[in-house]
Curated annotation (Swiss-Prot):
It catalyses: a plastoquinone + NADH + (n+1) H(+)(in) = a plastoquinol + NAD(+) + n H(+)(out); a plastoquinone + NADPH + (n+1) H(+)(in) = a plastoquinol + NADP(+) + n H(+)(out). Its main location: plastid. NDH shuttles electrons from NAD(P)H:plastoquinone, via FMN and iron-sulfur (Fe-S) centers, to quinones in the photosynthetic chain and possibly in a chloroplast respiratory chain. The immediate electron acceptor for the enzyme in this species is believed to be plastoquinone. Couples the redox reaction to proton translocation, and thus conserves the redox energy in a proton gradient. The keyword Disulfide bond does not apply. This is NAD(P)H-quinone oxidoreductase subunit 3, chloroplastic. It comes from the Eukaryota. The keyword DNA-binding does not apply. It is found in: Plastid, Chloroplast thylakoid membrane. Keywords: Chloroplast, Membrane, NAD, NADP, Plastid, Plastoquinone, Quinone, Thylakoid, Translocase, Transmembrane, Transmembrane helix, Transport. GO terms for biological process: photosynthesis, light reaction. Belongs to the complex I subunit 3 family. Its EC number is 7.1.1.-.
Amino acid sequence: MFLLYEYDIFWAFLIISSAIPVLAFLISGVLSPIRKGPEKLSSYESGIDPIGDAWLQFRIRYYMFALVFVVFDVETVFLYPWAMSFDVLGVSAFIEAFIFVLILILGLVYAWRKGALEWS
């Protein structure tokens, strides 16, 4: 017997949480005034007249640092529940978490050797 009624709250939440942003975009698209002109295409600098061209290319030096940080920050999300239930899970969970951390350390060493942590 297929017990779909157990997940009714989940499906209702999923449908409502998906419909709210879609409806917000649709309503704003229908109700917003459409005025095209040079003011809409100009850059905004805190109420001051723009000076120069706002479309210039610049290098982001911290991109690789941010990327490595995000990878190792997400690791914390996976390790925190394991640490909270460490005493219940036993030795096999410890070995699995150790392998997980070892893979992350190998990734850090790889990023280090590739120069992702250099300031160049």
